[in-house]
Each structure stands twice: as C-alpha cells, then as structure tokens.
Amino acid sequence: MIEFRNVSKVYPNGTKGLNNINLKIQKGEFVVMVGLSGAGKSTLLRSVNRLHEITEGEIMIEGESITAAKGKGLRRMRRDIGMIFQSFNLVKRSTVLKNVLAGRVGYHSTLRTTLGLFPKEDLELAFQSLKRVNILEKAYARADELSGGQQQRVSIARALAQEAKIILADEPVASLDPLTTKQVLEDLKKINEDFGITTIVNLHSIDLARQYATRIIGLHAGEIVFDGLVEEATDEKFAEIYGDVVQKSELLEVAVK
C-alpha cells in the first residue's frame, strides 16, 4: 500500500504544488489521476519515489517511510518503483535491449553495470519483458530508430525487467496518436492485471480515464477534489475537477485530445 500522510509541497517561488494530501492506494490498484496542467498530478506522482521532495508530511510504502529513507534503504525502495515518462527517458543511441537492462542496474554494483556485465538471468528477463509488450524483434535496434509508441513500450519493458512492484506513469500517452495510445494503455492494464503491479497513471483524457481506471483521483490546485470508482466519475464530477471555468464542450475537447 502507498499512503500519503498530510503531504504538502511548496516550491521555492512560493507556489503550492500539493496541499495536505491524505491518500491510500492499495496494492494492485490501477489508479488514474486527472486534472488540468498545474493541478499537482506530476508533483504527486513523482513524490512517491522522491523525484520531487515534499515539504511536509510523510509517504509510506508497504508500511515503510520513503520520506525518511536514506542511502541504501532509499535505493532499495526505489528499486521497487518503475517510472514511465512522457518523453520515454531512453538512451537514444543505445539498443533497445540495453535500455531494458537499465532496469536491472539497481540490483548490481556500479562497476558491473557500467561495463555492461549483466548475468544470464537478467538477459532472459529483458527478453521476456520485450516479448510481453510485443517488441522483441526490436531488441537490437537503436532506440532512436523506433516510433514514439514503440519507445514507450520499451519503457514499460524496462519497468518489467526491473521487477517493479509499483509503476508510475506520468502522462505516458500525451505525445502518441490514438491507436498507439490504446496499445500502450492496454499493455499497462494487462501488466497490472497479470502481475498485480500497483499502477498510477496521470492522464488528461476523461474518456481514457473512464476506460482503463478502476479508480479515478481528481486534483485541482494541489488538492484532491474527487476520489472514487469509475462509475462515480460523472460529467458533473469532472466539471468540479477541471474547475467552474470549464464548460461541458471543453470537457469533451479535453477527452478527445
């Protein structure tokens, strides 16, 4: 379980990114967070693995505080958290296989991984992960030779090879076309269902949130304004999430982007 206890984040310029967040996400959930740009979605997501440090409060993972973790303890906890970015975050000139093996770095010494000395078991796991997202044939291609959708699937394979217990996906389909968006989200959903990996995804699209989430969390101005099941996420609720200035026609526009 991931638990946020009175979590707040204030940026150096005084902007409040998160305001007293209290939230529990159970193991194996597929949670989609929605809200306007600047609502706090990325800040909340990235605070889980401390890519963003919080100002107040505490974040617990399986009963252990990642907020207080340091050194080896922090590295161990981060090893269980896979991160998927909008920009893919791949080494463009490296092969797909090497990018996936990057998910194993946390399990070995720095010298060993710098020299590319991964055991046979890691290689087998990397190939299995690529096969899982239907991109095994690209194992020896350079990452920059792949389409955006293929690169994002490599990112998912990297998280699988990492044997992550939690996957955080920050706007993973924002730059993808509708067909590729569907493929990437279906990959994430199937992995969630098959392996019980807790998955948190940030999305702008209302339709996609309703289609893939088991639970939707809406943020507005750094606060949770909705937290419920998909069937509870009515148009009226989405209007609250996106603010009074957003009319129904604009909500529909957001949904199809």
Swiss-Prot record:
Disulphide bonds in the chain: none
Catalytic reactions on record: phosphonate(out) + ATP + H2O = phosphonate(in) + ADP + phosphate + H(+)
Coiled coil: none
Enzyme class: translocase
Cross-referenced SMART domains: AAA (SM00382)
Membrane topology: Peripheral membrane protein
The protein's name: Phosphonates import ATP-binding protein PhnC
Record organism: Bacillus anthracis
